[in-house]
Amino acid sequence: MLVIHRRIAPQALWAAELLLNFEARSKSRLRCFSADGEDVGLFLERGQPPLHDGEFLQAEDGRVVRVCARPEQLLHVTCSNAFELTRAAYHLGNRHVALQVGDGWLRLLDDYVLKAMLEQLGAQTETIEAPFQPEHGAYGGGHHHSRHGDEDFNYPPKLHQFGVRL
């Protein structure tokens, strides 16, 4: 098994390629196969952005591995003007949809419910096969509800008694 722990800078040569869809590129722990069929175990640092097309990894045995975004079924969204495209992006963002943004277009994983919503908003949609590389997000840490890092603001609860004070 090819065991990988490290992301590395771009390289001129590589020994293996991983063809991964967006969901697989988002995982820090993954068992998969190289393009040549070799068993691969990814054990990357948690909390990092998803792997992107063209990124390089280094295996424990020193081999360099190139990540390739596998084409997947996407909705390619266009609108007749910038206002409508911005409105479509707003509604998709409000639903926390992973979104790839281009010059005059949006792309998201194919979903019939979102397609109907977009068409109701006046957008034109087309189903395509292409690699998916959505925006990572403005805050980089992902969406969570943990209280990690709130130690300085961890006050004991108070019992409030409402009514007449004597």
Swiss-Prot record:
Disulfides per UniProt: none
Annotated keywords: Chaperone, Cytoplasm, Nickel
InterPro entries: UreE, UreE_C_dom, UreE_N, UreE_N_sf
Pfam families linked to this entry: UreE_C, UreE_N
Compartmental location: Cytoplasm
GO cellular component: cytoplasm
Region (Disordered): 133-154
Single GO BP term: protein folding
GO terms of molecular function: nickel cation binding; unfolded protein binding
Role, per record: Involved in urease metallocenter assembly. Binds nickel. Probably functions as a nickel donor during metallocenter assembly.
UniProt similarity note: Belongs to the UreE family.
Entry protein name: Urease accessory protein UreE
Species of origin: Pseudomonas fluorescens (strain SBW25)
Organism classification: Bacteria, Pseudomonadati, Pseudomonadota, Gammaproteobacteria, Pseudomonadales
